[in-house]
Amino acid sequence: MKFIVLTDTHFVPHGETLFGGDPRARLDSAVQNIRDEHGDAEFVLITGDLTHRGEMGAYHSLQQSLAGLNLPVHLMMGNHDDRECLLKVIPSVMADANGFVQFTIETPELRLICLDTAVPGTSAGHLCRDRLDFLDCELGQSSNGTKVMLALHHPPFDVGIPSLDAIRLLDSRGLEEVLDAHRSPEFIFFGHVHRAVQGLWQGLPYRIQKGINHQVALDFSLSTEIPLSFESPEFSIVTLRENGHLVIHTCDFLYNGPLFTSRHKEHQSVF
């Protein structure tokens, strides 16, 4: 089975721009690529920061763009989002009994548990007891025959970019304790960082991917401001194969340069 993961769309109301870029145009391009190349996917997941300022008009524009997909779409919260506006504009968004945008995506092969780490008034992430209890319950319902994955907006660790490390998930101990009490998820997806980062945390493999509208520049020294850029965006194509093999490709969906083969005369010495 296959699914698609995007993050950090940072929508503004239709017709507006953000940092001189057009989030709607970029997501529309991603939607077109997914329609053309990945119509066999089970679902699409967006791991938070759906909008930049949490405006209702921005959620309306996001909803219009995503209507171009003939696939189920699951939306998560990020620190730039407004929970009340999101649920009002897009009532199909799943929330738990406490009103947090938390849910589990289930297929015969997979349980993907999606957590809400957003806290109004701060860019950093937090998991309160209610949210951790949700995770504890969902992990407890996972059978040994099904792959378990986890998705959060905020990573619970430093990535080495000081301006972002200051606004990560600040209370990771509670998350660690819940995970230690269960069979661990086999993979974790994060957003928030606006860079392609992968590694191991607590022995668990994870992936962070680039955002849709803009990226964070690769600056390991600046701590007072978050340096931004318009490096190319991407989305992830996640495939689970019958033998349990997990494969993740990234799609640079805005690339429109030439395609050639290793037999191309000018490139024979390179390949």
For the regions a protein language model found, what residue spans apply to each?
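Acidic, His/Gly-rich catalytic cores of divalent-metal-dependent hydrolytic chemistry
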Residues: I208-F271
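Active-site-proximal beta-strand elements of phosphoester/diester hydrolases
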Residues: M1-P13, E109-V119, M149-L152, L204-K210, ...
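Active-site environment of divalent metal-dependent phosphoester hydrolases
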Residues: V12-G15, H52-G57, N79-L87, P120-S123, ...
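N-terminal active-site segment of His-dependent metallophosphoesterases
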Residues: M1-S61, S65-G68
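Extended active-site neighborhood of metal-dependent phosphoesterases/phosphodiesterases
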Residues: M56-N144, G174-E177, A181-S184, Q202, ...
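His/acidic metal-ligating clusters that form di-metal
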Residues: A30-F43, G125-R207, E234-I237, L246-V247, ...
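Short glycine-enriched, charge-decorated loop/helix-capping segments at active-site entrances
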Residues: E16-D22, P91, G121, I161-R168, ...
